[in-house]
Amino acid sequence: MRAVLCGYYGMGNGGDEALLAALLQMLPARVVPVVLSGNPKETSDRHQVEAIPRKSLSAVVSALRRSDAFIWGGGSLMQDASSALNPAYYGGLMLLAQIMGLKTIAWAQGIGPLNQPFSQWLTRRALANCDGVSVRDRNSAALLHQWQRTCLLAPDPVWGLDYAPVEGLWDLPAPRVAVALRPHPQLTPQRLKTLAQALASFQKATGVCLLLVPFQPTKDLAIAQFIANHLTEQRSGPHHIYSLTQPQQLKGLFRGVEMTIGMRFHALVMAAAEGCRCFAVSYDPKVDAIAQNLSLPGWTLSPLASETSGNVSFLPPFPADSPTLCKTWLDFYANGDALSPDQIQSQTDRAFMHQDLLSETLFPP
């Protein structure tokens, strides 16, 4: 059996590359994957799979004609918060695959935000005709329940991704705290400056080594460099920028970290899975969702983020002054807890329910 895997792959985003790695890890051995990628050569070399250009309609249609199944491979594909084109692209391909008679799976999805009526209609239509659907958060499951679409609810598959060691990590000073930020309109220049000041104060008070982790370097590296420059100016302590391209190494990085401050959804997943204390800075309902599900402390950059997720008061607003940020982090660093081994094992075991969905849908008993 051949299956076309469709996601935000080959775009340099560590979280989506981790989803692809987890999908390939969980895919039944009898399935030959064909990956739609923004960088087919890189995807092919990294994962030893066939990869084709995601924007080449002729190549995509040819791949569908040669395949038996089509899989939305994890993440928040059907959302129009970043671009109205996302639902059109992913939803259009799903409908095309269904018209062509392929078996279709929406795998480990986070649905929404869907602000436009067309996005809502297209998502509902595409999901209605899928042979199997799994989602990674309760809000997505609740939406599908409203649409009378049955689905499997399980933690993000990256909980189950294998980790790999990171060369040189253990040579860095300890203890270590990771910071994984991303650009967003709500992370204004003033807020970023406040955050950098708070990190410098936090580092001076604790003596930690700060690891700045750009999950999508083309977008996140500038923020990491801004913070690194501020830490250098303040002479607050050792820091290191880690731009890792291997998803398993990205996850392995958090094995050597005591605490993570994360905007990136998969930074929080990976850190929590590796027994690290996590502090969320939310810009999106998916970050609100994991913070609520794991009872993580944190702040929301925008009240709209919590309202959209239905948890208006779960995360308090981002503070306006650096002393408040620093004090909150110091309290959490001193007194906060990571997930227990039993909690981590439970999340990991349940994440493999996505693997069961693949096997049962592609090869029904």
Enumerate the predicted regions with their spans.
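Active-site anion-handling motifs in enzyme catalytic cores
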Residues: 1-365
